[in-house]
Amino acid sequence: MSHQQIIQTLIEWIDEHIDQPLNIDVVAKKSGYSKWYLQRMFRTVTHQTLGEYIRQRRLLLAAVELRTTERPIFDIAMDLGYVSQQTFSRVFRREFDRTPSDYRHRL
């Protein structure tokens, strides 16, 4: 299996489990590769770290939820694995240059 295929398989697995606690330890265990080698391979293929990919994917899912539902921001944050609404809002604002509430109401 090529590095591209390995990473694509892992990305599919990550996307299926994005609502669960995910970090380099969990994904490395799933892949069977060392954390160091997995990070290197992931960055070579995707041009971003595994942590960046997971964060970006969660934030994109949150943005869809904010656009398409009236679910409370707290619930969206918890469902996507954030430990608090404040943490979620800070990370969301850093990515989208607005708070989740502003994002929801400006669309």
UniProtKB/Swiss-Prot annotation:
<dbReference type="InterPro" id="IPR018060">
    <property type="entry name" value="HTH_AraC"/>
</dbReference>
<dbReference type="GO" id="GO:0006355">
    <property type="term" value="P:regulation of DNA-templated transcription"/>
</dbReference>
<keyword id="KW-0804">Transcription</keyword>
<dbReference type="Pfam" id="PF12833">
    <property type="entry name" value="HTH_18"/>
</dbReference>
<dbReference type="GO" id="GO:0005829">
    <property type="term" value="C:cytosol"/>
</dbReference>
<feature type="DNA-binding region" description="H-T-H motif">
    <location>
        <begin position="25"/>
        <end position="46"/>
    </location>
</feature>
<keyword id="KW-0805">Transcription regulation</keyword>
<dbReference type="GO" id="GO:0043565">
    <property type="term" value="F:sequence-specific DNA binding"/>
</dbReference>
<keyword id="KW-0963">Cytoplasm</keyword>
<feature type="DNA-binding region" description="H-T-H motif">
    <location>
        <begin position="73"/>
        <end position="96"/>
    </location>
</feature>
<keyword id="KW-0238">DNA-binding</keyword>
<dbReference type="InterPro" id="IPR020449">
    <property type="entry name" value="Tscrpt_reg_AraC-type_HTH"/>
</dbReference>
<feature type="domain" description="HTH araC/xylS-type">
    <location>
        <begin position="8"/>
        <end position="106"/>
    </location>
</feature>
<dbReference type="InterPro" id="IPR009057">
    <property type="entry name" value="Homeodomain-like_sf"/>
</dbReference>
<dbReference type="InterPro" id="IPR018062">
    <property type="entry name" value="HTH_AraC-typ_CS"/>
</dbReference>
<dbReference type="InterPro" id="IPR050959">
    <property type="entry name" value="MarA-like"/>
</dbReference>
<protein>
    <recommendedName>
        <fullName>Regulatory protein SoxS</fullName>
    </recommendedName>
</protein>
<dbReference type="GO" id="GO:0003700">
    <property type="term" value="F:DNA-binding transcription factor activity"/>
</dbReference>
<comment type="function">
    <text>Transcriptional activator of the superoxide response regulon of E.coli that includes at least 10 genes such as sodA, nfo, zwf and micF. Binds the DNA sequence 5'-GCACN(7)CAA-3'. It also facilitates the subsequent binding of RNA polymerase to the micF and the nfo promoters.</text>
</comment>
<keyword id="KW-0010">Activator</keyword>
<dbReference type="GO" id="GO:0001108">
    <property type="term" value="F:bacterial-type RNA polymerase holo enzyme binding"/>
</dbReference>
